[in-house]
Amino acid sequence: MKIAVYSDKFSGTLTASEVIETIKELFEINSIKASYFPVTDGGEDSTIIFKEYGIAVKESLKVKDLVGTEKVVQLLDISGDVFFESSLLVGINNTDVDTMDLNTGCLSEIIKLPDVIGLGGSRTNDGGFGLLSKMGVNFYADKKLIEDPKP
């Protein structure tokens, strides 16, 4: 029998690679042979997983995240398509600031560069209104322009 083990991360506890290593150790103790593959759904930690499979970094950029902290993020070249993981800027682990005080506006600095944006693991819940606002879409409440829309 051939066994293939695929695992994504267990958010807040183990990365996909750590899950795989734990399973591998237990299988080896019990003389179980298998092949092991960390995987991702395109959300948080996608960049790490893709790079483990040899996906090349196309470009590294300095941009501000959802609380204004400058970060270095990477765009990957996946078979000619440029990939960006949005959680690098709006991720759950980027800040302890209340979610209701955050939005996706910081993604406007990078949105035009990738062909594919991995979603998931976001700390925001503004439905993209912050991003749309930065891209020129106006939102109003009681006929008053909302400058920095938040939930």
Located regions from the model:
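N-terminal loops that bind phosphate or other acidic moieties
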Residues: M1-P151
